[in-house]
Amino acid sequence: MDSRSPSLPDDRPDPPEQHLDARAGATLRGTAGPRGVRRILPFLGPAVIASIAYMDPGNFATNIEGGARYGYSLLWVILAANLMAMVIQNLSANLGIASGRNLPELIRERWPRPLVWFYWIQAELVAMATDLAEFLGAALAIQLLTGLPMFWGAVVTGVVTFWLLNLQKRGTRPLELAVGAFVLMIGVAYLVQVVLARPDLAAVGAGFVPRLQGPGSAYLAVGIIGATVMPHVIYLHSALTQGRIQTDTTEEKRRLVRLNRVDVIAAMGLAGLINMSMLAVAAATFHGKNVENAGDLTTAYQTLTPLLGPAASVLFAVALLASGLSSSAVGTMAGDVIMQGFMGFHIPLWLRRLITMLPAFIVILLGMDPSSVLILSQVILCFGVPFALVPLLLFTARRDVMGALVTRRSFTVIGWVIAVIIIALNGYLLWELLGG
C-alpha cells in the first residue's frame, strides 16, 4: 500500500524526509533519541498547516466586528469554538495515522459511487469558495500596504502562493516551516497590537464568563461557533498525517497519536490565542467609539491609524497578508487532496492554483465588494460542514477502519455533541444569511 499523502504528487520526493523519520522513529520505538522539547519537534507540523484556516481573513472580519460591537463579552465564544476545533482536528489527524487513508479516500472506497461524486463536487466548491475569500484577503492586504490596485495585489498573491506550494517539491517539512513562519508573523503582529491597544485586563477576564448582550451578540456568537469547523482542513489534516511518519507496530502508532495530540493542542491553542487577541484589540480600540462598519477590513485598517498610530495599521495589514497568503496556499493543497481522494487522480498544483485564482480575478475585475464575497463564501462553507463532520465521526468510531486505535465511545459521544451543535448553528446561520 502506498502510504504517501495525496497532497504530495508523484513528482516530489517521498515523504517524510529521512532525517525527520530517523529522529521520530527513535522516539516512537523508545530507543535513544532527542530529549526535552527536541523530542517532539519531528511530530509538529500537520496541525500548524491546518490551524492557518482558523486565522483566515474571514476570522479577522468576524473577530473585529465582535470586539467593536460587544467589547470583550464574546471571548468565551472564541474559547469554546477553539476547544471544539481541537477535538475535530484531532479526530481527523488520528484517522490518517490509524487507517493509512485520508477521509476522501475512505469515502471513495466504502460508499456508493453516486454519493462519492456528490461528495467530491460539494467539497471542491467549498474549498474553492474558501480559497476565494482567502485570496482576496491577501490581495486586499497588499493594496492597504502598498497602494497597489487589487488586481496587482492579486497577481502578487498568486506568485507568492505558487512559491509556497512549490516548497512541497522538497518534502513536507519546508512547507510546514514556511506556514509556521506565517503563523508566527500573525502572532507577533497581534502581540504588538495588544501592547499598543492596552486592553482592560479585568474586562478581558470577565469576557470568559458566558453571557450574551441581546439578539445581535447571539447572532455573532452563532457565526463564530458555526464557522469553527473548516470542512476543507478536515479532509486535508487526515492526509497530512497519513504516512508522514513511518510506524511498524500498533504501539508505535499509539505513541504517534499521543504525540500528534501535542501538535494539535499547541497549534490550535495558538490559533485560539490569536483570535482572542484580534477581538481584544478591536474591543480596546473600537468599542464605544462609534466606529461604523468596523468589521470591514479596510475600515478597520483606516481607523487604527488615528486611534493607535500608523504602526498598528501596518501590523494589522501584515497579519492579514500573512493570513491570506498561507491560508490560500493551504486551500489549494486541500483541493488537491479532495480530488485525489474522491476521484483517484490529480492535476498539477500549479494548474489547480491557476484555476482557483480565476474567480478572484473575476470578482476584482467586476468591482465586487470583498466583504460581500466573504459573506458569500461563508454561506457556501455552511453547506459543507455536515458533509465533512459526519463521515469523520462514523469512520473514527469503526474498528475495521481504525483498528486498535478506534476512538473511545466517550470521545465519540463528545464528537457527536459538538457536531450537532455546529451543524445546527450553521443551519441557523445559513438561514439568516440567505434570509438577509
Swiss-Prot record:
The chain crosses the membrane at residues 40-60, 71-91, 115-135, 144-164, 177-197, 216-236, 264-284, 304-324, 354-374, 375-395, 411-431. Keywords: Cell membrane, Ion transport, Membrane, Symport, Transmembrane, Transmembrane helix, Transport. It is found in: Cell membrane. GO terms for biological process: iron ion transmembrane transport; manganese ion transport. Belongs to the NRAMP family. HAMAP family: NRAMP. This is Divalent metal cation transporter MntH. It comes from Deinococcus radiodurans (strain ATCC 13939 / DSM 20539 / JCM 16871 / CCUG 27074 / LMG 4051 / NBRC 15346 / NCIMB 9279 / VKM B-1422 / R1).
